[in-house]
Design a protein with these regions (language model features):
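Class I SAM-dependent methyltransferase Rossmann-like catalytic core
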Residues: 43-57
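Glycine-rich SAM-binding Motif I of class I
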Residues: 82-90
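S-adenosyl-L-methionine-dependent methyltransferase catalytic module, highlighting the catalytic core
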Residues: 134, 138, 149, 157-270
Length: 271
């Protein structure tokens, strides 16, 4: 069953009689932004999460260099899946990636990415595409130097397919995801209540267990940035890493930290 957001229509104002400003563009989606503007634009107001100043991209950049990916993102062909509002795209572009192709399935998020590209002066090396990232990976026969998937894995109903396709279409990856942590769920009944069952699954020869997460009332928010269904399947940390190994990744750098929704894994890997 697919989620049908109540905000399916384009409901922002069609004409502005005021002086043109960058804030006007951000205000097309007033109340829907997750990201705050870059720190060098304190004059602008949007969301509250500092994704345009996110240290995770610098972390990935340096860990990639540590494992022998010369210059990290710099000079690399990068595929980004689920850019949300373009914050990580902006940071990778500022590291002078040779090209960034960012695929976003959420139509409102895609439009916010275009606003961010214009407002925050991303380069012509950045291209945003509207569509399903899994369909893109299945059909576009291209191998990228680095693939980035931040905040995506735990919004899918077949997360291992994403890991398989990342291995097929990239030589190195940066992955950030929340994962199913039974200790966290036991100690935090509110987010824990959103999990309803666990199921055995198999994809491309990899057997694993997934835990159903139900979005619930979150689906009613115009700025909802989850998946396209009313639920998703979460994996445990050890099985995420095991799946990547199964599909050919051999060198890993990982870091775990707490998150409001559960334990989070930050990972770079290369073949």
């Amino acid at each position: 069953m697919s989620a049908t957001p109540p905000s399916a229509s384009t409901d922002f104002k069609h004409f502005f009689g005021a002086v043109p400003t960058d804030q006007n563009a951000l205000d097309l989606f007033a109340g829907e932004w997750s990201s705050s503007p870059p720190s060098d634009r304190p004059d602008l107001k949007a969301g509250v999460t500092p994704l345009f100043d996110d240290p995770r991209i610098a972390w990935a950049h340096h860990r990639l260099m540590d494992m022998g990916v010369e210059n990290g993102f710099t000079g690399r062909d990068v595929l980004e899946l689920g850019p949300l509002e373009g914050g990580h795209t902006y940071l990778i572009d500022r590291l002078n990636a040779a090209a960034v192709t960012a695929v976003e399935a959420n139509a409102r998020a895609y439009l916010k990415c275009l606003i961010a590209k214009e407002t925050f002066r991303m380069s012509a090396r950045v291209r945003f595409l509207l569509g399903d990232c899994l369909a893109h990976l299945r059909t576009v026969d291209q191998t990228h130097d680095i693939a980035v998937a931040s905040g995506l894995l735990y919004h899918l109903t077949n997360p291992v397919e994403l890991l398989e396709l990342l291995a097929r279409r990239s030589n190195a990856i940066f992955l950030w995801t929340v994962f199913y942590d039974p200790d966290f769920v036991a100690q935090n009944p509110v987010p824990g209540a959103k999990f309803s069952e666990q199921l055995p699954m198999e994809h491309a020869g990899f057997k694993h267990t997934v835990h159903r997460f139900n979005y619930g009332p979150s689906l009613d928010w115009k700025g909802f940035c989850g998946g396209g269904d009313i639920y998703s399947y979460w994996m445990e940390k050890k099985e995420i890493i095991a799946a990547l190994e199964h599909f050919g990744f051999r060198d890993f750098r990982t870091e775990q930290h707490p998150n409001v929704h559960g334990s989070a894994l930050m990972l770079v890997a290369r073949k």
